[in-house]
Amino acid sequence: MAKILIVEDNATFRQSLKELLFTRFPSMEFEEAADGEEALEKIHGIAPDIVFMDIKLPGENGLRITKKVKAEYPELIIIILTYYDLPEHREAAFQYGANHFLSKGTSTQVIVELVQSILSEKGLDSQGSLRD
């Protein structure tokens, strides 16, 4: 079963994203983290398949956390999801190891399609289970 970690300091946005994804992928496991330190603990503890990472977080920013995580878990898919949708942020996200970059204004359909695409690439079905 696939696991998704949502790293976002805004509890309302974090919950909204979780609800959106749960509606489409109800058998997946979802975890949340409000800052970089909690994110690192959860990544080590649950080994998620996908991480949604905000850039602006309390303490260490999401780009630095992404770099640390990718050094240890290069196969982990990290999606930067931020309001900072500027070319320099996008470029920095990819330099730090992010796999995808989305604006928080991105349509829910695009987010769901991206998750579905990642699951397919990982050999998982639409519910996050291994395909037979």
Task: Kindly give the residue locations of the regions a language model identified.
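Conserved acidic carboxylate
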Residues: 8
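Two-component/phosphorelay signaling modules centered on CheY-like receiver
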Residues: 11-31
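Acidic, metal-coordinating helix/loop segments flanking the phosphotransfer/catalytic sites
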Residues: 32-50
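Acidic catalytic/metal-coordinating carboxylates
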Residues: 35, 61-64
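Short amphipathic alpha-helix used as the core "switch/output" element in two-component signaling
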Residues: 41, 63-73
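Active-site residues of response regulator receiver
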Residues: 54, 82
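The feature encodes the CheY-like receiver
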Residues: 58, 86
